[in-house]
Amino acid sequence: MSNCKYAGKIKEFIPKLTPTLHKGQCGRIGIIGGSAEYTGAPYFAAISALKLGADLVYVFCCKEAGPVIKSYSPELIVLPILDSGNVTEKIENWLTRLHALVIGPGLGTKPVNIIRLCNERSKLSVLPLIIDADGLRIVNDNLDLIKKYHGPVILTPNEVEFKRLSSKFSNTEAINVASSLNSVLIQKGSTDVITNGINFDEFDFTFDDVTITCETFGSNRRCGGQGDILSGCIATFVAWFELFKSNNTFIIPLSSVSCYGACAVTKTCSKLAFQKFGRSMTASDMIGCIHQSFTSLFGS
C-alpha cells in the first residue's frame, strides 16, 4: 500500500461493501455542468465519482449536451434540463436525494445561478457543494451567497482561478480567502494546499479547522480534465463523510480528510497513467487508473 499520511483516518469513513447495502447507500452525487461547447468536463467529473465508488451520479446539463454525455457512458443519469424554463423547480426536486453536488464543470457562461437556489434550499438541506471551473465565476460575482450558505462549500481553483478569486481580498493567502468565504479551499498545484481558514502547526483530528498539504506526486503531464476528475473524487469522499457522520459520533475534519483523500487519489492516477502512456496521457487514461489508485492508497 502506498504511503498516504492520513490513510487510516480516511478508511474510517469509506463504506464497507456488505450484502445488506442497497443502491444509493454509498453515495448519490449530482453534477451541474455541460453545455453545447463543453461536454467532456461534466463527464469526467461524473465518471470519476462513479468509478471511485459512488452508487449513483446525476448530470444536470443543457439540452445540447445531453445526447453527447449519454453517449459517453450508459451508467450516468443524464438530465438535460438546465436551459428549460422551470429549471429551478426541476432541479429542486432532485436536491434532497443527493449527498453532494458539484457545480461548474463545462457549465460555460450560461447564467444558471444554482448556488442561489441551493442557498434557498438550505432551509431544509445543507447539501455539500463542490465548486469548480465555471462555477467559480459565479462565486466571484456572488461572494455573499457562499458566505451565507449553511452547508459545506469546497472551492477548487487552479492557479489562474485562485488569482482571480483572491484578488477580491486584501490578504490573498489561501487561508484568508477560505476564512473570508466560510469555505474549504483547495489551492491546486504541485502541492495541494487544503484549508478552511485556520492554521495549526500540527494536525489534530479533534479540530475541524485545519490547513494541510497533499504532497503526493502525480506527473508533469498537464492534460485537460484533471481538475474535473478531482471534483468528482471530492464529491464521493464528501458524500462518504456525510454518510459516516450521520451514522457515527466520531468527528473528523471535512476539509482535511475527505479533500486530502481526493487529492491523493487524483495525483496517484496521474502518476500511474503517466507511467503507462507518457506524453500521450489523457484524462481518460487517468479514469482507467482510479481503482488501482484507490486500492494502493486505502486497500480494497
UniProtKB/Swiss-Prot annotation:
Pfam families, per database record: Carb_kinase (PF01256)
Residues binding ATP: 188-192, 218-227
Top-level EC class as recorded in UniProt: lyase
Superkingdom, natural source: Eukaryota
Biological process annotations from GO: metabolite repair; nicotinamide nucleotide metabolic process
Cofactors named for this entry: Mg(2+)
GO molecular function terms noted in the UniProt entry: ATP binding; ATP-dependent NAD(P)H-hydrate dehydratase activity
EC number(s) given by UniProt: 4.2.1.93
Domain YjeF C-terminal: 6-297
InterPro entries attached to this UniProt entry: CARKD, Ribokinase-like
Catalyzed reactions: (6S)-NADHX + ATP = ADP + phosphate + NADH + H(+); (6S)-NADPHX + ATP = ADP + phosphate + NADPH + H(+)
Protein name: ATP-dependent (S)-NAD(P)H-hydrate dehydratase
Organism: Pediculus humanus subsp. corporis (Body louse)
Taxonomic lineage: Eukaryota, Metazoa, Ecdysozoa, Arthropoda, Hexapoda
